[in-house]
């Protein structure tokens, strides 16, 4: 509960994900943040419910172990067997989540809060993590916002000074995810003007080839 308050309620823009997810997903469970939609979902969870969830999904055959450092593969296997070998496998439900229908119209939400600066958050549906184009979107997000020479930073922050900061990134979801653009317009710049400038840059991205040197920054 304290983590929910700290991350989602007690800081500016902390609940952006809670507001954006239901806009983007109408059927898929991604509309639910992992931590819950509101504080009551955490507060009202019983110990029995938590234990049932744990023993339903937390099993060695439903986990990935990542090991880094100065260790050989053989040592990693030996230590894994030592510390986790006695944990029994369990029957885990087959992952069968509903597919999100194609979005055919724009959805938008305007929220007024006591925050330091206006902020613009845009999201577009993209392919899932297993699709070859996933890496294309990953590179496109870098072309748009990774480094001072990136398109959004160069054109909208440095040249036109429409934004004080702006970023583009992908959600990295296993199922179909989102391509995000988030930025804070400069003082005196309306959200409408800021949004129009971003859309212009996206149009330009479709019309102009990306230089080779920029695609590997």
Enumerate the language-model features and the residues they cover.
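Charge-rich, well-structured scaffold segments of protease-associated domains
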Residues: 1-92, 110, 128, 136, ...
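His/Glu-based metal-binding/catalytic segments typifying zinc-dependent metallopeptidases
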Residues: 5, 22, 92-149
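Phosphate-proximal small/polar/acidic motifs at interfaces that engage nucleotide phosphates
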Residues: 153-154
């Amino acid at each position: 509960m304290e983590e929910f308050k700290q991350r989602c309620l007690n800081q500016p823009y902390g609940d952006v994900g809670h507001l954006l997810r239901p806009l983007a997903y109408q059927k898929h469970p991604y509309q639910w943040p992992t931590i819950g939609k509101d504080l009551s979902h955490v507060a009202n969870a019983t110990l029995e419910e938590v234990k049932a969830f744990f023993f339903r999904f937390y099993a060695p055959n439903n986990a990935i172990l990542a090991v880094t450092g100065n260790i050989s593969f053989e040592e990693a296997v030996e230590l894994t067997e030592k510390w986790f070998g006695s944990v029994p496998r369990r029957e885990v439900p087959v992952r069968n989540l509903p597919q999100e229908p194609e979005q055919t119209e724009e959805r938008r939400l305007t929220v007024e809060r006591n925050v330091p600066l206006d902020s613009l958050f845009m999201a577009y549906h993209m392919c899932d993590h297993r699709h070859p184009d996933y890496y294309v979107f990953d590179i496109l997000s870098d072309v748009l916002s990774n480094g001072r020479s990136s398109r959004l930073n160069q054109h909208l922050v440095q040249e036109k000074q429409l934004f004080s900061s702006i970023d583009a990134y992908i959600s990295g979801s296993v199922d179909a995810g989102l391509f995000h653009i988030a930025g804070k317009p400069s003082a005196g710049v309306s959200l409408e003007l800021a949004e129009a400038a971003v859309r212009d840059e996206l149009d330009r991205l479709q019309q102009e080839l990306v230089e080779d040197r920029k695609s590997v920054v």
